[in-house]
From Swiss-Prot:
Its main location: secreted. One of its GO terms (cellular component) is nematocyst. GO terms for molecular function: toxin activity. This is Granulitoxin. The keyword Metal-binding does not apply. Residues 1-21 are annotated as: Disordered. Keywords: Nematocyst, Neurotoxin, Secreted, Toxin. Injection into mice produces severe neurotoxic effects such as circular movements, aggressive behavior, dyspnea, tonic-clonic convulsion and death.
């Protein structure tokens, strides 16, 4: 996952991905 971006690892929360990094 990437900061500030929705990706396959999960949605972002407070600028950080919900799962993964």
């Amino acid at each position: 996952a990437k900061t500030g971006i929705l990706d396959s690892d999960g949605p972002t929360v407070a600028g950080n991905s919900l799962s993964g990094t």
